[in-house]
């Protein structure tokens, strides 16, 4: 048994929360409010349809409790997806606005780390700079040609790398 998340970050993160609930029982919000730690997670698989959050490769999830509108995250190696199908063709029907939002999300995740102080960050900063350049260059290409496979592939890969411990 496993959960197949078909979509972007919100869908994937919801699948992770469901996986915690199935594997552990009780109230899922106990994990997200840090009242208890998960002892497992139903395996997650992903078919990515928008490049943005990097959730397809991460051990983190962020969900919103609509009762009080509390947005909070939880991370555990248990919920890192077992596989992610990342086919840029699945993003080609996205409206330009959603593509731009995804590219902006990738940039923000990368800049968040880039502008955080730290020692001995030369390599990490160089990776972040390369990711930002890649996203900016390919966002321009996608504005002119939304069906450009290579630009979508570059953005998809950058999104997965930008929020998964490299930067």
Language-model region placement:
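N-terminal small/polar loop signature for handling phosphorylated ligands or for N-terminal nucleophile
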Residues: 1-26, 141-152
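Short glycine-rich or small-residue beta-strand-to-loop segments that form or flank ligand, phosphate
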Residues: 3-6, 45, 162-163
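Active-site segments that bind and position negatively charged phosphate/pyrophosphate groups
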Residues: 113-167
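Surface-exposed, flexible loop/turn segments at secondary-structure boundaries
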Residues: 11, 52, 163
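A glycine/threonine-rich phosphate-anchoring loop and its flanking beta-alpha core
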Residues: 23-120
């Amino acid at each position: 048994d496993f959960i197949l998340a078909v979509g972007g970050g919100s869908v994937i993160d919801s699948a992770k929360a469901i996986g915690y609930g199935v594997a552990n029982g009780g109230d899922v919000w106990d994990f997200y409010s840090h009242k208890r730690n998960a002892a497992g997670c139903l395996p997650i698989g992903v078919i990515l349809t928008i490049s943005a959050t990097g959730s397809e490769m991460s051990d983190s999830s962020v969900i919103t409790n609509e009762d009080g509108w509390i947005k909070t995250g939880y991370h555990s190696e248990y919920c890192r997806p077992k596989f992610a199908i990342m086919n840029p063709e699945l993003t080609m029907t996205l409206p330009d606005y959603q593509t731009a939002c995804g590219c902006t999300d990738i940039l923000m995740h990368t800049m968040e780390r880039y502008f955080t102080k730290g020692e001995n960050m030369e390599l990490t900063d160089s990776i972040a700079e390369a990711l930002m350049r890649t996203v900016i260059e390919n966002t321009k290409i996608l504005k002119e040609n939304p069906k450009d496979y290579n630009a979508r592939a570059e953005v998809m890969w950058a999104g997965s790398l930008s929020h998964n411990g490299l930067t």
